[in-house]
């Protein structure tokens, strides 16, 4: 090893040790229910194989951008290793693989003991390696995935393309919208079998709230637009017919669908990558730090975790090409830490910049009596309002309430220009973020104007006490930015200063996908960017 490379690797080991102490020296679970978890979901307790010491390419993360990258690399003949900190959860039509939003246990959350969601109802449980990581920063809670398949396991399934004019406003010409519209959005729609909610599902009992939502927005002068969705409608039909346990028709989604109702990445991109024989996913592999040697080879410090959080081993892996797909938070943490500690010394001044929440806000308004039992999960429709600040509202379900309350929930996405910067804390080895409380209030206010207009014209109640707030912008499920295209990277995700290093996920997006859910755009950009990378 070259002298410089030796010291860099030694530095990486020190950084990884500090990070392991900070991040998750997650305590081993003391949950007596772990024995039950082992009987319910034995698959996640199977021995975890070690990732190979060296691979042509390593992909960190297994969400939308990472999964696209793994498949397209494999198809190009490039052997790749996918590293995922979370477990690989199976699906079954009858077993309760995942916990519910209403009375969750440790399977729901990544090594935490309490959670207060959008309903503002506090819940407690014992720590375990569950699927949803709630990362708390000053001013904002960020929801992100910890499972093989990433966000596709826990999101609500809506995959919508933004309008060109708003997309261009956000991306500033770095990405050609026409190219996405003509090539990459259609490719993703085909790969993920996206389509609108069928009429029989829409008119079923669990979607009475969707029909009432549409009636109210029409009364207010809006025309609801149908959403494309990743749900497999035949699985919902099985639920309605009683030939599968209720999940997507019974307010379950944020913590996973046991019966595989969502056509998540384990059923498409990751599966297809594995079937090439040139890509393998390694669950329980948390990446703590990254470096580049003088030779150009990359070093990845990894901790292998049991579902309980116990660290089973630590190793340094190497690769020729390194693709970051750990999501806005995970990718930004790795890059900011590497820049601060000198393991990637040539990163530019834009690393850590451009974080935004996609303008997320959850709203609730009342309704007249709804003839239904519980709320179905898939979002049937949306409206867009440009009368002031551009806002999209989507028909949503109320997480954690499996019965019908008469409330109608919306997920709002506001065109919010606010951006924040990730910073490194040398004393702890952690990476932090400050989010403005004033921004929270502004986002909530912009969405509230639209929701109140609907409530007023539909004769509904705008303030709904069961949710604690009529508008809650204290969280985001759509973190974006931190390594933005055209700034920290070139226009295709190649990281400036470190050839062979790429950003392939939501960290590359400048804080917003222009008032729609980010998943379709993240996936389409990954398709576009990996195609350019492979061209050379």
Predicted regions and their residues:
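N-terminal export signals
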Residues: 5-27
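Glycine-rich loop(s) and the adjacent beta-strand/alpha-helix scaffold that form part
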Residues: 75, 79, 85-100, 290, ...
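Conserved redox-cofactor binding core of oxidoreductases
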Residues: 173-286, 472-479, 484
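C-terminal segment of N-terminal export signals and the immediately downstream linker at the start
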Residues: 1, 21-56, 75, 90, ...
């Amino acid at each position: 090893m070259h002298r410089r490379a030796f010291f860099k690797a030694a530095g990486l080991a020190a950084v990884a040790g500090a990070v392991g102490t900070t991040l998750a020296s997650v305590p081993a679970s003391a949950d007596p229910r772990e024995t039950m978890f082992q009987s319910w979901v034995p698959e996640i307790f199977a021995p975890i194989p070690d990732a190979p010491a060296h691979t042509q390419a390593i992909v960190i993360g297994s969400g939308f951008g990472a999964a696209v990258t793994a498949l397209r690399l494999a198809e190009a003949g490039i052997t790749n290793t996918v590293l995922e900190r979370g477990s690989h959860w199976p699906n079954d039509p009858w077993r309760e693989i995942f916990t519910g939003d209403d009375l969750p246990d440790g399977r729901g959350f990544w090594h935490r003991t309490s959670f207060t969601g959008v309903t503002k109802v506090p819940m407690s449980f014992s720590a375990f390696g569950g699927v949803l990581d709630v990362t708390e920063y000053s001013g904002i809670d960020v929801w992100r995935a910890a499972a093989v398949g990433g966000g596709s396991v826990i999101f609500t399934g809506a995959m919508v393309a933004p309008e060109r004019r708003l997309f261009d406003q956000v991306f500033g010409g770095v990405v050609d919208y026409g190219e996405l519209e003509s090539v990459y959005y259609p490719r993703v729609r085909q790969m993920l079998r996206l389509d609108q909610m069928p009429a029989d599902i829409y008119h079923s009992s669990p979607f009475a709230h969707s029909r009432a939502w549409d009636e109210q927005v029409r009364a207010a002068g809006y025309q609801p637009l149908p959403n494309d969705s990743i749900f497999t409608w035949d699985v919902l039909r099985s639920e309605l017919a009683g030939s599968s346990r209720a999940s997507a028709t019974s307010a379950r989604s944020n913590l996973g669908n046991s019966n595989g109702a969502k056509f998540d990445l384990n059923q498409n991109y990751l599966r297809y990558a594995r079937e090439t024989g040139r890509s393998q996913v390694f669950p329980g592999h948390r990446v703590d730090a990254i470096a580049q040697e003088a030779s150009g080879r990359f070093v990845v410090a990894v901790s292998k975790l049991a579902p309980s959080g116990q660290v089973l081993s630590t190793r340094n892996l190497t690769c020729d090409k390194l693709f970051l797909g750990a999501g806005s938070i995970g990718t930004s943490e790795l890059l900011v830490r590497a820049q601060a500690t000198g393991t990637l010394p040539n990163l530019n001044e834009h690393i850590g910049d451009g974080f935004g929440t996609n303008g997320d806000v959850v709203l609730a308004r009342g309704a007249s009596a709804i003839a239904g039992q519980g709320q179905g999960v898939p979002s049937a429709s949306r409206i867009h309002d440009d009368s002031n600040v551009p806002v999209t509202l989507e028909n949503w379900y109320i997480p954690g309430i499996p019965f019908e309350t008469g409330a109608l929930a919306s997920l709002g996405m506001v065109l919010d220009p606010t951006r924040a910067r990730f910073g490194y804390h040398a004393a702890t080895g952690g990476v932090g973020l400050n989010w403005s409380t004033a921004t929270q209030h502004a986002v909530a206010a912009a969405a509230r104007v639209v929701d109140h207009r609907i409530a007023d014209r539909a004769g509904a109640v705008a303030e709904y006490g069961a949710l604690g707030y009529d508008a809650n912008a204290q969280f985001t499920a759509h973190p974006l930015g931190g390594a933005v295209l055209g700034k920290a990277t070139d226009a295709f995700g190649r990281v400036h200063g470190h050839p062979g290093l790429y950003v392939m996920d939501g960290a590359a997006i400048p804080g917003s996908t222009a008032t729609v859910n980010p998943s379709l755009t993240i996936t389409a950009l990954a398709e576009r960017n990996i195609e350019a990378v492979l061209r050379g």
